[in-house]
Amino acid sequence: MSTINTDTNETMPHVSVNAQYIKDLSLENPSAPSSLAALDQRPQIDLSLDINITNLSEENFYEVELNIEAIARNEKYKLFQIELKYAGVFNLINIDSEQHPVLLSVHCPAMIFPFARKIIASCTQDAGFQPLMIDPIDFGALYHKKMSEHQN
């Protein structure tokens, strides 16, 4: 049997997820029902993702917001457009402030992304389409790309 020493856990660096929530969700299905009958080929999907980080009033508390937009089109129709703002409140405990930017830009979005992905898949399926399964995102690569763009 193992015993957990809570004194040690309180001083260990860790990220705590205090809340996760939908801030905004919109799905447009503008050409239904005609577009639902025209699903003989895979639609073109245009996907955009942005991350917003807000420093909250309590020390070391941050809101990390994923903004995801997907537009599906085929030759005839704009099939659907979905926009989701999904956020989490994170507490960075006993973590050096120099490490905060990378944790907030990489680790925290990676923690909440699967939930946002599931919401988008469910909504697109409920709109009469195949569920939109967004591929996993390498938030580390996005962060490094953004940092290199800022240095240039």
Swiss-Prot record:
Belongs to the SecB family. GO terms for biological process: protein folding; protein tetramerization; protein transport. This is Protein-export protein SecB. It comes from Rickettsia africae (strain ESF-5). Pfam families: SecB (PF02556). It comes from the Bacteria. It is found in: Cytoplasm. Its main location: cytoplasm. Homotetramer, a dimer of dimers. One homotetramer interacts with 1 SecA dimer. GO terms for molecular function: unfolded protein binding. Keywords: Chaperone, Cytoplasm, Protein transport, Translocation, Transport. The keyword Protein biosynthesis does not apply.
